[in-house]
């Protein structure tokens, strides 16, 4: 799954109506009212503000007075298809005087949201296994050289009589250490979520 790194705002105009879409990093559904009000301040006097958000298993959408099915549910489907979560999309629509009809209105809302989504910058959310290892300084130097090639990262390192390191990667870290003849103690610490720029 990917999540926005920063807010992205895009605008399209169709038959004198303006559609301003906001893609917003969003991690807490309790913050919805605050974010929604902020968008309304950024785009005052818009006629409607349909929205959708996904945070984990929580999904919510609304059309804010637009004809049913014009935007919100379609935003959710698009976000799911594109693998986007922890995100809020809100489109401020300024009516230009010409009715678009429901099919064109739906397409235009989707086009505006897709533009904000497709041009956004993202983090990839991944779960990594954590392991605590105790190393000699020689083992540390060997591991520091080979670990990145196997996708293993040093998350925390303490230097003392020996080196204590917290490594993140996949389940193969213990066997990788054995392959390198690193025989220090290796203890699993669980999992951690990481964000990587994409």
What are the residue ranges of the model-derived segments?
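Terminal alpha-helical anchor/extension segments at protein ends
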Residues: 106-118, 132-134, 183-198
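Short amphipathic alpha-helix segments
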Residues: 134-152, 176
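Non-DNA-binding regulatory cores of transcription-related proteins
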Residues: 153-171
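Active-site beta-strand/loop microenvironment that shapes enzyme catalytic pockets
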Residues: 74-118
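Structural motif
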Residues: 22, 50-51, 86-89, 132
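C-terminal regulatory domains involved in ligand/effector binding and gene-expression control
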Residues: 1-70, 156, 181-198
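Helix N-cap motif at beta-to-alpha junctions
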Residues: 28-30, 136-139, 168-175
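Short glycine-/aliphatic-rich beta-strand segments at the starts of folded cytosolic domains
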Residues: 122-137
């Amino acid at each position: 799954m990917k999540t926005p790194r920063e807010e992205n705002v895009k605008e399209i105009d169709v038959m004198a109506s303006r559609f301003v879409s906001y893609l917003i990093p969003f991690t807490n559904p309790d913050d919805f009212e605050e974010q929604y009000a902020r968008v309304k301040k950024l785009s005052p006097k818009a006629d409607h503000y349909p929205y959708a958000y996904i945070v984990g298993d929580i999904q919510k959408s609304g059309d804010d007075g637009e004809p049913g099915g014009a935007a919100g549910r379609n935003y959710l489907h698009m976000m799911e298809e594109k693998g986007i979560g922890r995100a809020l999309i809100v489109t401020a629509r300024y009516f230009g005087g010409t009715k678009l009809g429901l099919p064109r209105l739906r397409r235009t809302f989707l086009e505006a949201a897709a533009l904000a989504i497709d041009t956004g910058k993202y983090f990839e959310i991944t779960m990594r296994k954590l392991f605590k290892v105790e190393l000699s300084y020689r083992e540390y130097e060997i591991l520091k050289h080979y670990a990145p090639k196997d996708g293993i990262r040093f998350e925390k390192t303490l230097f003392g009589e020996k080196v204590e390191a917290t490594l993140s990667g996949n389940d193969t870290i213990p066997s990788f250490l054995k392959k390198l003849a690193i025989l220090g103690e290796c203890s699993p610490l669980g999992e951690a979520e990481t964000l990587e720029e994409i």
